C-alpha cells in the first residue's frame, strides 16, 4: 500500500519508519528543509512517562487565574478574539475534574510506557546516537503544598506501572548533587528510574536518514495546502493531497492512505473536511547553554515543579525548557520568559554553564485539552491521525508511530489505549489521596 505521511517531526518520522518496516511504500512531506525542524527541534529532551499528569488537573483553574497577566508565568493564557482559543479553554476546564484527570493519566501512562519501550528497541536496532542518558528523571519541589498535592497522581502512576517514587529532600540531593546549593529550599521530590533523556532532533534526523536509506521518500521544502476527498459517509475517502513543491509548483499526490502528523497545524488542514480536532498551539520555550564546569552541571534529568521547567544534559550542553503560552501561532520570543529561564537556571547551577550566550528557541506544542493525543482512524476511511501530543511528543513519538503503522496495516496495537475510531473499554479509575 502507498502511504503519504504529512509531517516529519518525531511522530511523522516514526510513523514512516514503521510503515516502511511493514512493507508499505511511504512518502513523507514537510515544508521545512529537513526532518525535526519545528516542534521536535529543541524541546526539553525528556522521555518522561512520569509527566503523565496533564496541565488540566483539579488545581489548574486557580493557578491559571493567579498567573493571568504575569509575563513569566509557567502557564500564560493570553486571551484573543478567537473562537477556537475560547472553546479550547472551556474544554480544558472540563478536563480538570478528578475523574477526568485520572482517566487521562491512565491513557498517557499507557501510550508513553509503550513508546519508551519502543524507543529502546529502536535505539538497539539502529544504533542512533542522540546524547541519551538512561538515568531516570528527578522531580523536585520547593513548596510543601505543591509537593503534598502531587502525591495522589504519583501514587496513581505507580499503580499503573510507572515507578514514580516519592523521596525526601536529602535523597533528592543525594541523587543529584548539583542541587546541593538549594538544599534548604527543597521540601521533597520523586524519582522515576525508568525515564530517560536525549536530543529528539538528533534522534529524528538519524531515524529519517535510516528511513530514507530503507526506501522512504522525503519531500522537503514542500507545503501541504489541502486534502481532496470524494464520497460521503462510510464511502468517503481522501483522493489526494495538494502541495506546493520546492520549485513553487502546485501538484496533487495520490496514495492509498494518508497520515496527518502536522502537530498544531493538523486542525486547520482537517477542518475543511468536517473533522474538528480540539488542538490549540501552546508555545513552549527552551534555552540551551554550553556547559563550562561539568562537575557543577546536573547529570540526571530534572523537573523543577515550581517553575514548570525541565533540565536535560545533552552531551556538553544543558537544555532547559518549559512554560506554556496559549497565544495563537506566533513563535516570536518573549524576552521576559527567556530571561526567567536563564535567571532560574543560574540560581540552580550558578557555576555550571555559560549563561551569557544562551540559545533561545520556541516551538508550538499541539495541545489537546486533556493532553491525550489523537492516534488512529478518522471518519474518512483512508485518513489516519497521529497528532495532538502536547508536551509529550518526544515521550510518545516512537510508540505512536508504531501504533499507527499497525492500525493502517490492519493490526491491533499492543497497548491499552483509546485509539480514535476503534472500540475501547477500560475499567473506571479514580484519583485517590496518596
PLM features: what roles do these ranges have?
Residues 164, 305-306, 330-332, 346-434:
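C-terminal catalytic lobe of FAD-dependent flavoproteins
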Residues 43-51, 55-95, 180, 220, ...:
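Active-site substrate-recognition segment that forms the wall
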Residues 151, 155-184, 191-280:
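Predominantly flavin-linked oxidoreductase catalytic cores and closely associated redox partners
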Amino acid at each position: 500500500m502507498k502511504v503519504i505521511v504529512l509531517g516529519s517531526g518525531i511522530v511523522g518520522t516514526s510513523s514512516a519508519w514503521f510503515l516502511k518496516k511493514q512493507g508499505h511504500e511511504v512518502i513523507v512531506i514537510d515544508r521545512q528543509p529537513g526532518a525535526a525542524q519545528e516542534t521536535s527541534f529543541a524541546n526539553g529532551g525528556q522521555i518522561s512517562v512520569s509527566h503523565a499528569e496533564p496541565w488540566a488537573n483539579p488545581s489548574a483553574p486557580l493557578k491559571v487565574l493567579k498567573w493571568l497577566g504575569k509575563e513569566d508565568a509557567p502557564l500564560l493564557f493570553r486571551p484573543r478574539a478567537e473562537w477556537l482559543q475560547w472553546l479550547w479553554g472551556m474544554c480544558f476546564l472540563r478536563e480538570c475534574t478528578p475523574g477526568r484527570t485520572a482517566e487521562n493519566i491512565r491513557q498517557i501512562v499507557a501510550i508513553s510506557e509503550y513508546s519508551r519501550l519502543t524507543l529502546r528497541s529502536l535505539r538497539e536496532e539502529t544504533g542512533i546516537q542522540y546524547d541519551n542518558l538512561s538515568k531516570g528523571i528527578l522531580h523536585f519541589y520547593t513548596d510543601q503544598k505543591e509537593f503534598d498535592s502531587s502525591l495522589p497522581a504519583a501514587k496513581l502512576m505507580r499503580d499503573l506501572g510507572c515507578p514514580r517514587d516519592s523521596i525526601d529532600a536529602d535523597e533528592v540531593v543525594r541523587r543529584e548533587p548539583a542541587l546541593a546549593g538549594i538544599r534548604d529550599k527543597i521540601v521533597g521530590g520523586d524519582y522515576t528510574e525508568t525515564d530517560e533523556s536525549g536530543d529528539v532532533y538528533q534522534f529524528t534526523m538519524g531515524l529519517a536518514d535510516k528511513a530514507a536509506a530503507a526506501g522512504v521518500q522525503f519531500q522537503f521544502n514542500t507545503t501541504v495546502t489541502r486534502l481532496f476527498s470524494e464520497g460521503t459517509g462510510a464511502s468517503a475517502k481522501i483522493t489526494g493531497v495538494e502541495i506546493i513543491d520546492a520549485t513553487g509548483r502546485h501538484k496533487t499526490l495520490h496514495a492509498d492512505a494518508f497520515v496527518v502528523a502536522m502537530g498544531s497545524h493538523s486542525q486547520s488542514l482537517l477542518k475543511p473536511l468536517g473533522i474538528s480536532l480540539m488542538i490549540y498551539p501552546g508555545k513552549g520555550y527552551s534555552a540551551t547553554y554550553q556547559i563550562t564546569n561539568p562537575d557543577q552541571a546536573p547529570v540526571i534529568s530534572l523537573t523543577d515543579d515550581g517553575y514548570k521547567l525541565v533540565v536535560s544534559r545533552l552531551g556538553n550542553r544543558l537544555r532547559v525548557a518549559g512554560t506554556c503560552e496559549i497565544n495563537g501561532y506566533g513563535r516570536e520570543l518573549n524576552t521576559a520568559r527567556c530571561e526567567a529561564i536563564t535567571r532560574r537556571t543560574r540560581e540552580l547551577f550558578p557555576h555550571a554553564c555559560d549563561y551569557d550566550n544562551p540559545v533561545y528557541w520556541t516551538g508550538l506544542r499541539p495541545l489537546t485539552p486533556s493532553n491525550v493525543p489523537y492516534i488512529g482512524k478518522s471518519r474518512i476511511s483512508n485518513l489516519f491521525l497521529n497528532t495532538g501530543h502536547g508536551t509529550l511528543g518526544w515521550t510518545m513519538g516512537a510508540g505512536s508511530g508504531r501504533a499507527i503503522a499497525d492500525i493502517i496495516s490492519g493490526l491491533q496495537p499492543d497497548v491499552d489505549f483509546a485509539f480514535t475510531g476503534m472500540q475501547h473499554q477500560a475499567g473506571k479509575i479514580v484519583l485517590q489521596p496518596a
